[in-house]
Amino acid sequence: IHLPNIEYAIKRNLSRFNYLMQEGYAVILPIYLSTYERIDDLKSDYPNESEEYKDHVIKWGKDYKRAIDYIVSRDDMDASNLTYHGASWGGFMANTLLAIDDRVTSAVLYVGGLCFQKSKKEVEAYHYTSRVTMPVLMLNGKFDQFFPLESAQIPMFKLMGTPENDKRHYISETGHFVPRETLIKEHLAWLRKYETN
């Protein structure tokens, strides 16, 4: 189940998931509020203290849970191996989403972290991070300008409630990206490591 960065949330481009589909994995792209044809008046995906932002986080959580409900209802999908993949905004939202539903069994977070911007307490991401307990792989750039290593990536990694031996923080000598070859190699290895069947 995927939550994209906001740039990709406007246009669909499934080719970036070819490496997963070629290995037999299903890729689920829920149509979250404010993405694809559900674009609305939300001014920014950055956290803020408005009621509008709080309401959006709650609705994104509902969209996420509905997507999981759908996967679980299907006989042709293995819901026991459900993995979350979040990219940028999706890596940040993982702080909240992974904490609100325990049916996801592992996660790969691509260039995510905690944000500096404050939001209402009910949806403040760091309040949820310690409730993330499944295996998590974080793939980040050392020089990321959106999620800096020392102030966004490392705090998120340390706050997660995942046992130390089930979480990994891969740091590339890059900015707000990790080379595609690295993403593919690390992502597939993580999926294989935590498959239950």
Language model features: what each stretch is:
Residues 162-197:
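C-terminal catalytic histidine-bearing segment of alpha/beta-hydrolase fold enzymes
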Residues 1-62, 119:
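Cap/lid segment of the alpha/beta-hydrolase catalytic domain
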Residues 132, 138-140, 144:
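Short beta-strand/loop motif that positions the catalytic acidic residue
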